[in-house]
């Protein structure tokens, strides 16, 4: 295709740019000026710089806000990998805020499909807008959430891992980390309006796929 379209990942969880916003579910148009960490501030700056590029050089640009992506080949420093590894090895897993936290877990295959479909939803003039759009009036630019639209309690997530491994976790309950947020929850209606698609993998099914991959890859 001859038409250019820059696509950027703003963050791996929308709590980064949304910061202390307590409105649920998170909408792309919600005010996002109360970042709680330097990491989150860089993500908000990333979105601002992308908007500037889109305006100055008329480059159609879509920013993705990912919500707690998980699945096979996930990063070893992320919760699902760390929890699964700790459970298999019999080492304690750190559970912040005593497990009373919520995350919108999004399976990686759903994420990839959402990205692929959004690549064809090129932002442009007002004629490209849909209901609930974040299309900028100053540039061919929009922000889109990609999330499962379902907040899951952290303890339920851990119990799903225990059920798949058949092993009870050794739990180390801890206080909330400074700069962390109590919950993330995506309003993915813009993704649906632009593409007709919405992530749908139930967290228990996604965890089962990850644990199977982990068993096969690490031979446990």
Feature names for model-found ranges:
Residues 1-10, 16-63, 70, 74-75:
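Catalytic helix-loop patch of NAD(P)-dependent Rossmann-fold dehydrogenases
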Residues 11-12, 145:
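Rossmann-fold scaffold of SDR-type NAD(P)-dependent oxidoreductases
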Residues 14, 66, 98:
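Active-site loop/turn elements of alpha/beta-hydrolase fold enzymes
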Residues 20, 60-63, 77, 140, ...:
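Non-catalytic, surface-exposed connector residues within folded enzymatic/regulatory domains
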Residues 63-66, 104:
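Residue-level recognition of specific faces of alpha-helices
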Residues 69-70, 176:
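Hydrophobic pocket-lining residues within nucleotide cofactor-binding pockets
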Residues 85-220:
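C-terminal substrate-binding subdomain of Rossmann-fold SDR/epimerase-dehydratase oxidoreductases
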């Amino acid at each position: 295709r001859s038409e250019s379209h820059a696509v950027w990942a703003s963050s791996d969880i929308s709590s980064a740019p949304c910061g202390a916003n307590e409105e649920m579910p998170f909408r792309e148009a919600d005010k996002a000026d109360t970042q709680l960490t330097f990491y989150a501030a860089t993500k908000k700056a990333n979105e601002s710089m992308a908007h500037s590029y889109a305006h100055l050089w008329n480059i159609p640009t879509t920013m993705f806000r990912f919500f707690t992506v998980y699945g096979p080949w996930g990063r070893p420093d992320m919760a699902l990998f760390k929890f699964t590894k700790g459970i298999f090895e019999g080492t304690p897993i750190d559970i912040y805020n005593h497990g009373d936290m919520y995350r919108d877990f999004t399976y990686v295959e759903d994420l990839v499909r959402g990205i692929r479909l959004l690549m064809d939803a090129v932002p442009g003039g007002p004629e490209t807008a849909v209901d609930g759009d974040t299309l900028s009036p100053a540039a061919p630019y929009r922000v889109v959430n990609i999330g499962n639209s379902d907040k899951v309690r952290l303890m339920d997530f851990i119990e799903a891992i225990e059920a798949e491994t058949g092993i009870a976790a050794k739990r180390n309950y801890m206080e909330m980390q400074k700069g962390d947020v109590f919950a993330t929850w995506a309003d993915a209606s813009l993704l649906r309006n632009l593409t007709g698609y919405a992530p749908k993998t139930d967290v228990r099914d996604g965890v089962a796929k990850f644990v199977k991959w982990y068993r096969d890859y690490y031979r446990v």
